């Protein structure tokens, strides 16, 4: 009996001790602030306050993320001049792959590489963890006041009329 209790306690501790994410960010709450220093730029979320932000967590090794990127680019171009900024945060651990991807695909977005660790259960990175994000792609729409308005888990077709209209209404 004593051995069974010990095994049960170790199992419970083991499962709760392995959790590496934070509490997921909720709609209607302030977006957690962060600063990422990439090789050629530093981006702080709060410095973008006053704009509508589409915050996208992605990586070059993530096929759905790569598939989603063209629609993010198209949406950014369509909404240009309307106070909407796409901030793409890469959790790539390999800087060379990241920079090669940006160059090869002519990515013209505000994008920074935080780096991260790919695991069997998702991805670990400090900024993604602030949002409770462990699976990518994951995106947030943040209003001009820094409040999370929408959250998307998985790839999104950012050209959808519903999304474009939603972003237009936030202006």
Task: Go through each PLM region and give its residues.
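Thiol/disulfide oxidoreductase modules built on the thioredoxin-like
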Residues: 105-107, 114-166
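N-terminal targeting signals for export/organelle localization
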Residues: 1-35, 151, 161-165, 170-171
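Residue-level signal for well-ordered, solvent-exposed loop/turn and beta-edge residues enriched
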Residues: 29, 41-42, 147
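Short, acidic, Ser/Thr-enriched surface-loop or helix-capping motifs
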Residues: 25, 37-38, 142-143
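Short pre-active-site segment immediately N-terminal to redox-active cysteine/selenocysteine motifs
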Residues: 51-53, 57-61, 135
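Structural microenvironment flanking redox-active thiols in thiol-disulfide oxidoreductases
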Residues: 67-107, 118-129
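A short beta-strand-turn-helix
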Residues: 33-53, 76
């Amino acid at each position: 009996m004593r051995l069974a209790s010990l095994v049960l306690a170790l199992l419970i501790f083991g499962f709760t001790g392995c959790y590496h994410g934070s509490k997921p960010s909720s709609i209607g709450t302030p977006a957690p602030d962060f600063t990422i220093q990439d090789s050629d730029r530093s981006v702080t979320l709060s410095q973008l306050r006053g704009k509508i932000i589409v915050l996208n967590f992605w990586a070059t090794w993530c096929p759905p993320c790569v598939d989603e990127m063209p629609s993010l680019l198209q949406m950014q171009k369509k909404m240009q001049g309307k106070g909407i900024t796409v901030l793409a945060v890469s959790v790539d651990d390999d800087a060379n792959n990241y920079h090669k991807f940006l160059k090869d695909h002519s990515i013209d977005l505000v994008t920074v590489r935080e780096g991260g660790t790919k695991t069997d259960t998702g991805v670990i990175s400090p900024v993604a963890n602030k949002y409770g994000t462990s699976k990518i792609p994951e995106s947030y729409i943040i209003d001009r006041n820094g409040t999370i308005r929408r959250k998307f888990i998985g790839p999104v077709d950012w050209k959808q009329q519903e999304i474009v209209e939603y972003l237009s209404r936030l202006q």
